[in-house]
């Protein structure tokens, strides 16, 4: 499975580089982002490695996982041209800008001084794996 993600990520990065690195891409509005994501599960990669997946539900609700079986429910909203997410257990918003590149979404975290982007590596209608709550014995 990891080989599949790596292959998809390499292909996506190749298209991104060949297209000029997204220099001409425009930041998505909230309505464009909603139209692109609603009802989908998107898998993201960063620097050649799988990063996480997010399921986009109705009413701007989301479910995020770092692909470790642990999923966090949350929601998103638009603020000052950015798409901001709040997840259960954290009240601090995580804000991003999104652009539609030749191979999918490109996400830039607004609080990242090194500006390392996330790239959509797979758009899927399939469910991501969310294990149940941890039970201590």
Regions found by a protein language model. Name each.
Residues 21-73, 84-137:
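Lipid interaction determinants
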Residues 2-11:
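Bacterial N-terminal signal peptides that target proteins for export
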Residues 10-19:
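Bacterial N-terminal signal peptides
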